[in-house]
């Protein structure tokens, strides 16, 4: 009886840990998706003319992006050791073998955003801003993001 309780308890703890790990992976993915919303759904679409240029939306997108990027280091502190179920992209285990190098990819993104913030005034300057920020996102993805499907 006592043994059964211990076994069931251990199993429950195991399930809890797996769920917590999936939750961490989801949080990390959600942060990236939120960044994508600002940079791709708003800014990139405007550069392509898919949606009309809107100064307020540009300024908001850059402000949101800045806030999100500042959360990357902390959000990726814990290794979830699993991917989000059905995700297209996953986090490389290299992140947690070399977290300092991973973190070093963040300030260049912040600098690219700071450099263009308040200076974007039209589609042409938005295009330049998009490229300079996106190139810095890519610098991290090349090493630390895995394509799963
Ligand atoms: C310091 C590293 C790093 C930086 C900087 C970074 N990312 Fe990521 N990104 C990752 C990792 C790791 C993943 C894969 C794991 C995940 O999705 O959480 C990822 C995944 C993504 C995904 C795929 C999400 C999905 O599952 O569909 C998008 C979109 C994305 N990032 C956008 C951005 C944008 C936009 C920026 C720049 C503003 C950016 N990222 C900056 C590390 C980074």
Put a short name on every predicted segment.
Residues 21-149:
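Sequence context surrounding c-type heme c attachment/ligation sites in exported
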Residues 7, 17-18:
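Cleavable N-terminal signal peptides
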Residues 13-14:
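N-terminal leader/signal peptides at the extreme start of proteins
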Residues 2-10:
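Sec-dependent signal peptide recognition
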């Amino acid at each position: 009886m006592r043994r059964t309780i211990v076994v069931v308890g251990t199993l429950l703890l195991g399930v809890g840990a797996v769920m917590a790990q999936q939750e961490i992976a989801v949080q990390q993915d959600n942060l990236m998706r939120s960044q994508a919303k600002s940079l791709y759904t708003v800014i990139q679409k405007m550069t392509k003319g898919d949606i009309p240029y809107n100064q307020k939306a540009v300024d908001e997108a850059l402000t949101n992006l800045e806030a999100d990027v500042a959360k990357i280091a902390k959000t990726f502190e814990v290794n979830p050791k699993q991917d989000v179920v059905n995700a297209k992209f996953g986090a490389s285990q290299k992140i947690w073998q070399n977290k300092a190098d991973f973190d070093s990819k963040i300030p260049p993104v912040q600098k690219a955003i700071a450099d263009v913030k308040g200076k974007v005034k039209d589609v042409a300057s938005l295009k330049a801003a998009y490229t300079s920020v996106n190139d810095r996102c890519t610098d991290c993805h090349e090493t630390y993001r895995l394509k799963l499907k």
